[in-house]
């Protein structure tokens, strides 16, 4: 890890902070993305992506897309997640790791923050605005941000982002400077259940299981026929199906 890279901000638990009476509205609410965290900066004239642990990642299409922006902003560090709506988390990680993976250009960078070492006390609302100039850049997404002024508004934001296929909501302090490490300046909030199911059918990209009431459902991912897998979902609907199911792991993974 180089001197240019900071420790990424990490999220506290929203429900725990709410139970302590530690919330201070308003906040920004943003989608919780199930991707790979990265910090991005310009190093010796080249755009470099670093993992959360400081390892360099090679995604040339993203480096090229960010070169004009970061060249004009020396020292700036972008904070976001590598993510693809069309790849499972396992396939996403494989595409990121492999130098020649055919799915590599399916990976986009979802940005939600930045850090300017020349303005270490800069409020989040201003850091977020600094990302606007990246709107419309290929392979780059600036996450949607909603202003929430109550817990009820947080619940509505959670439903909104889950409805878009995300796994939850991130709650950000509007006025806080960038906090390295874990702090309540950023909180995560999601409502999901985990259950085990037997795989009854498979194809190249999906697996199929049955709910306890006998309703079939399919999710993206790969597993063996008859294998027991862990599925994460929001709730069981009145007709017995799962809302927003997602493959988490198989027993082989454990």
Tell where the protein language model's regions lie, with residue ranges.
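Classical nucleotidyltransferase
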Residues: 30, 36-80, 181-254
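Phosphate/adenylate-binding "loop-and-lid" substructures adjacent to NTP/NAD/dNTP-binding pockets
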Residues: 1-23
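Short, motif-level signal for alpha-helix interfacial/capping segments enriched in acidic residues
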Residues: 11-17, 90-94, 149-155
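Short, basic, glycine/proline-bearing loop/turn elements
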Residues: 1-2, 136-146
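Short, structured patches in soluble enzyme cores that scaffold and shape functional sites
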Residues: 80-82, 111-116, 144-147, 173-175, ...
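A short, Trp-centered hydrophobic/proline-enriched beta-strand micro-motif
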Residues: 7, 27, 78, 168-172
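Amphipathic alpha-helical
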Residues: 3, 145-193
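Covalent nucleotidyltransferase
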Residues: 17-138, 253
């Amino acid at each position: 890890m180089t001197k240019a890279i900071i420790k990424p901000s990490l999220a506290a638990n929203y429900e725990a902070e709410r139970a302590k009476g530690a919330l201070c509205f308003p906040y920004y609410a943003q989608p919780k993305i199930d991707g790979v965290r990265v910090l991005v900066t310009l190093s010796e004239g080249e755009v470099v992506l670093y993992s959360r642990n400081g390892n360099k990642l090679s995604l040339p299409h993203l480096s090229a897309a960010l070169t004009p922006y970061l060249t004009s902003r020396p020292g700036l560090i972008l904070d976001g997640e590598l993510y693809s709506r069309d790849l499972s988390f396992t396939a996403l990680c494989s595409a990121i790791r492999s130098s020649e993976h055919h799915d590599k250009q399916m990976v986009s960078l979802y940005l939600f923050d930045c850090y300017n070492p020349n303005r270490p006390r800069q409020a989040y609302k201003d850091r977020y605005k600094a990302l606007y100039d990246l709107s419309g850049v290929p392979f780059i997404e600036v996450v949607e941000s909603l202003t929430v002024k109550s817990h009820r508004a947080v619940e509505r934001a959670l439903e909104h982002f889950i409805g878009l296929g995300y796994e939850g909501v991130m709650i950000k302090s509007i006025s806080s400077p960038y906090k390295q490490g874990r702090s309540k300046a950023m909180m995560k909030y999601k409502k999901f259940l985990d259950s085990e199911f037997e795989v009854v059918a498979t194809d190249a990209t999906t697996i199929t299981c049955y709910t306890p009431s006998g309703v079939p459902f399919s999710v993206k991912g790969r597993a063996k026929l008859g294998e027991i897998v862990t599925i994460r979902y929001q709730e069981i609907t009145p007709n017995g199906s799962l809302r927003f199911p997602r493959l988490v792991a198989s027993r082989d993974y454990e």
